[in-house]
Amino acid sequence: MTSRGTPDFCLAYRALPSELKLAARRAYQKFSENPAHPGLRLERLRSNPRAWSVRVTQNCRAVALRFEDDAWVWIWIGSHQDFDREFPE
């Protein structure tokens, strides 16, 4: 498995408060060890069959695109409220 963030993802990550950055790093560690870790609540988005979201905290999610070679490209991170606006079902 490979994984990387887009420039937009990296900008959004850098804008997060430090406690959310720490939570995002912890979530990514779990993801890199086991993408199906129950704490991540990995979910496929109905709007795009390549798009998946993971739970960072109770109020924060991250979105990645998954490709056939098991490459993940992180495209978005933010609040659940913003997630619902950006990725309506």
Name what the model sees in each region.
Residues 2-4, 56-89:
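Enriched for short, Lys/Arg-rich terminal
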Residues 3, 25, 36-39, 77:
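Non-catalytic, surface-exposed connector residues within folded enzymatic/regulatory domains
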Residues 10, 28, 52, 74-76:
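Tryptophan-centered motif/residue detector
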Residues 18, 36-39, 63:
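Hydrophobic residues in alpha-helical membrane-spanning segments
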Residues 29-54:
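A short, surface-exposed loop/turn module that caps and links secondary-structure elements
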